[in-house]
């Protein structure tokens, strides 16, 4: 079973890998700001630099600060669902996107009036993460990265003069053994938190709620089958992961189950495939909210385990709790975005 063994070895750091973005590849050659915004992203770093930066970011990403957001999550979820039109409600555009972007904005300390800009930048930048990127999308991503970088620098400068109880202030103040994050590193972290946090949450909500509706299970059956909202969230993100693969390069000659992978080989870690491995999960294509094995791959693993998993879990638990109370039904079969790496729908039309 190459997939599961490879995943297991990656998570336990037995397979030495690096990311294509760690060195400037041809993909970034003409796009200075996109490269600049990715250069110190935790997703792209390895070794001591990754360890140092992740440690500093983790100190700023305080569990208590995340927990303090729960009342805001509850309020925002109820507000958006109260506004819904019973005959024309797009769960992605009218709920998931404004819900997710408002929470990331609240965490970072971004004014609500700027959330629409954040949403636009995120949509444009993440298109660069797929296999097929056309010139127009690449140019749009470059401009979005430049605008985002300039905006974040301005906000960071203001926080140094006027500190707040927000993530940007904490990132600017955190230190370890007299080591601090540079402005460039902080801005890359802000961009990562938006793109990874927002896009993943939106697509998990869309993929997951479609799964709930298509399963034909009632809210009562789902509640009876699961012991907690966390059970529901973990099963939905396993069943249809928002991130389907991650690309890396092998740093040393490696062997997995007698399969030789030469140094320098490009490998794709297929997270969605590992999550549907029948040798690991019983009836993997079925939604089972009482599943004992919750060891899926959607949060990543090892040194690259999702640093915002605690925030994402809370966002999703609050959302699905309120969505399940709505007794919504599917109004039209949704269309996939067509992207391979980041998996989601263009829309998800639901109603009473």
Walk through the language-model features, giving the residues of each:
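Cytochrome P450
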Residues: 1-352
């Amino acid at each position: 079973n190459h997939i599961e063994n490879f995943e297991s070895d990656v998570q336990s750091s037995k397979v030495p890998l690096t990311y294509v973005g760690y060195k400037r590849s041809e993909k970034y050659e003409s796009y200075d700001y996109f490269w600049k915004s990715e250069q110190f992203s935790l997703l792209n770093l390895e070794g001591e630099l990754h360890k140092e930066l992740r440690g500093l970011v983790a100190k700023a990403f305080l569990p208590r600060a995340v927990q303090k957001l729960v009342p805001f999550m509850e309020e925002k979820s109820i507000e958006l669902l109260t506004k819904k039109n019973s005959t024309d409600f797009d769960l992605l555009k009218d709920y998931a996107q404004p819900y997710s972007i408002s929470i990331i904005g609240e965490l970072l300390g971004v004014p609500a009036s700027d959330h629409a800009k954040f949403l636009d930048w995120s949509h444009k930048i993440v298109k660069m993460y797929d296999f097929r990127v056309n010139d127009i999308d690449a140019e749009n991503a470059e401009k979005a990265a430049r605008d985002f970088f300039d905006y974040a620098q301005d906000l960071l400068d203001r926080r140094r003069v006027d500190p707040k109880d927000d993530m940007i202030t904490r990132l600017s103040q955190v230190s370890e053994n007299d080591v601090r994050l540079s402005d460039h590193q902080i801005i890359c972290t802000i961009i990562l938190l938006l793109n990874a946090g927002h896009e993943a949450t939106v697509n998990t909500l869309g993929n997951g709620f479609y799964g709930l509706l298509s399963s034909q299970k009632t809210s009562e059956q789902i509640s009876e089958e699961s012991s907690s909202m966390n059970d529901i969230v973990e099963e939905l993100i396993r069943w249809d992961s928002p991130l389907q693969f991650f690309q890396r390069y092998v740093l040393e000659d490696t062997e997995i189950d007698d399969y030789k992978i030469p140094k320098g080989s490009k490998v794709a870690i297929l997270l969605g495939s590992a999550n549907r491995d029948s040798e690991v999960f019983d009836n993997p294509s079925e939604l089972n909210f009482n599943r004992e094995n919750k060891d899926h791959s959607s949060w990543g693993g090892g040194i690259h385990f999702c640093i915002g998993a605690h925030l994402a879990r809370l966002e999703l638990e609050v959302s699905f709790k309120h969505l399940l109370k709505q007794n919504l039904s599917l109004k039209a079969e949704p269309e996939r975005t067509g992207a391979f790496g980041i998996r989601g729908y263009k829309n998800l039309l639901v109603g009473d």
